[in-house]
Amino acid sequence: MRIADYSVTKAVLERHGFTFKKSFGQNFLTDTNILQKIVDTAEIDDQVNVIEIGPGIGALTEFLAERAAQVMAFEIDHRLVPILADTLRDFDNVTVVNEDILKVDLAQHIQNFKNPNLPIKVVANLPYYITTPILMHLIESGIPFCEFVVMMQKEVADRISAQPNTKAYGSLSIAVQYYMTAKVAFIVPRTVFVPAPNVDSAILKMVRRPEPAVAVEDENFFFKVSKASFTHRRKTLWNNLTGYFGKTEEVKDKLTKALDQAGLSPSVRGEALSLAEFAGLADALKGQGL
């Protein structure tokens, strides 16, 4: 019997008198086939260390620990720590850290892996309410995670993996795809969770690029420009950029020159631009002193 088997999950929760906290976005997966697919998608073996976020009662952790060199699981809810000590007692390669992943010194914790030089993959069922902050925090942390295989709200997975000229494409797509390739591996129906969420989930696989997708002069400025370009989706690039940089004649003149240099029409919308075109635009705007 697996931790994720519904009868086992129910028994564990009852034995420990556990009640779900909405503020932590807790939804426990009770489908062993899906858990197996997640671990297979992540290609976990004994030459990989794994960071897990939000292990819950250890359903996914169990599958990870059977194959990984080590698993370090970060759980914010202190009530789950004794439950995890119970459900994962047979594994000596799992460390549970009762910390908020957004506040912890991750670089320091990673040194506690027995072999910190092994590749590190992030595999997690992320809480919906904080998916994007956690992802961007990890991607921008400077820690060389080679891969992320994470469960999230399907809508967010679609936005992250979206391509230009689609409804889902936006600044989040650009922010992630600058660093990683991103592809939806498979869909997870809401019916396999306890309690069931209101929407379906998706497993998103992200692999770190050896180098960023495009070369830019100033990364922070590149992200600011891409974000500004999607402020109002139905507005043109010109309207969004004048809204961000200002509408003085001097600014308009610089914007006109930058757009011309980047080979872009003022009437185009942000959703039509590729990463390379955003890179060219950002560098041209920077060159104009904006």
Swiss-Prot record:
Record key words, sorted: Cytoplasm, Methyltransferase, RNA-binding, rRNA processing, S-adenosyl-L-methionine, Transferase
Gene3D superfamilies assigned: Ribosomal RNA adenine dimethylase-like, domain 2 (1.10.8.100), Vaccinia Virus protein VP39 (3.40.50.150)
Top EC class for this record: transferase
CC per GO annotation: cytosol
Any one Gene Ontology molecular-function term assigned to this protein's record: 16S rRNA (adenine(1518)-N(6)/adenine(1519)-N(6))-dimethyltransferase activity
Sections of the chain in a coiled coil: none
Binding positions (S-adenosyl-L-methionine): N27, L29, G54, E75, D100, N125
S-S pairs: none
Annotated localization: Cytoplasm
Pfam families: RrnaAD
The UniProt record lists the keyword S-adenosyl-L-methionine: yes
EC number: 2.1.1.182
Matches recorded under InterPro entries: KsgA/Erm, rRNA_Ade_diMease-like_C, rRNA_Ade_Mease_Trfase_CS, rRNA_Ade_methylase_Trfase_N, rRNA_adenine_dimethylase, SAM-dependent_MTases_sf
Catalytic activity: adenosine(1518)/adenosine(1519) in 16S rRNA + 4 S-adenosyl-L-methionine = N(6)-dimethyladenosine(1518)/N(6)-dimethyladenosine(1519) in 16S rRNA + 4 S-adenosyl-L-homocysteine + 4 H(+)
Main location: cytoplasm
NCBIfam families from the UniProt entry: ksgA (TIGR00755)
Function: Specifically dimethylates two adjacent adenosines (A1518 and A1519) in the loop of a conserved hairpin near the 3'-end of 16S rRNA in the 30S particle. May play a critical role in biogenesis of 30S subunits.
Family to which this protein belongs: Belongs to the class I-like SAM-binding methyltransferase superfamily. rRNA adenine N(6)-methyltransferase family. RsmA subfamily.
Identification of the protein by name: Ribosomal RNA small subunit methyltransferase A
Naturally occurring in which organism (per UniProt): Streptococcus pneumoniae (strain 70585)
Designated gene of the protein: rsmA
